[in-house]
Amino acid sequence: MLSAEHRLRHKDDFTVALKNGARAGTRRLVLHWAVTDRAHPTRVGFVVSKAVGGSVVRHRTQRRLRHVAAGRLTTLPALGGLLVVRALPAAGTATSAELAVDVDRGLRRLGLVATGAGDG
């Protein structure tokens, strides 16, 4: 479970990550990473639009992504990071394992984990 202190909730934080952060994409996801000078722990947020599917599909996709992200928090820098995971339409039909592979690939492309790290 992704604890409250690690959840990204405010519009301004999403904007910083989406507009000013580095970006890495896969077929199903786009990851946005920004480093802030705040003394907050690294926080993760999700954007799952109607393009992904209906309400049930969107919520299922977000739950899967939240579970994957919670398992990757230990590989991310401890303080000041904002990670936004934006789901593309193909994410709606992806399994949890496929989403995990895409998150790991995006984190490697952003330089946040070493090659081979975070798999699992």
Curated annotation (Swiss-Prot):
One Gene Ontology MF term: 3'-tRNA processing endoribonuclease activity
GO cellular component, one term: ribonuclease P complex
Family annotation (HAMAP family): RNase_P (MF_00227)
EC number: 3.1.26.5
UniProt entry tagged with the keyword RNA-binding: yes
Name of the encoding gene: rnpA
Assembly, per entry: Consists of a catalytic RNA component (M1 or rnpB) and a protein subunit.
Function: RNaseP catalyzes the removal of the 5'-leader sequence from pre-tRNA to produce the mature 5'-terminus. It can also cleave other RNA substrates such as 4.5S RNA. The protein component plays an auxiliary but essential role in vivo by binding to the 5'-leader sequence and broadening the substrate specificity of the ribozyme.
Catalysis performed (reactions): Endonucleolytic cleavage of RNA, removing 5'-extranucleotides from tRNA precursor
Family to which this protein belongs: Belongs to the RnpA family.
Alphabetical UniProt keywords: Endonuclease, Hydrolase, Nuclease, RNA-binding, tRNA processing
Pfam families: Ribonuclease_P
An annotated GO BP: tRNA 5'-leader removal
Species for this entry: Kineococcus radiotolerans (strain ATCC BAA-149 / DSM 14245 / SRS30216)
Name assigned to this protein: Ribonuclease P protein component
Coiled coil: none
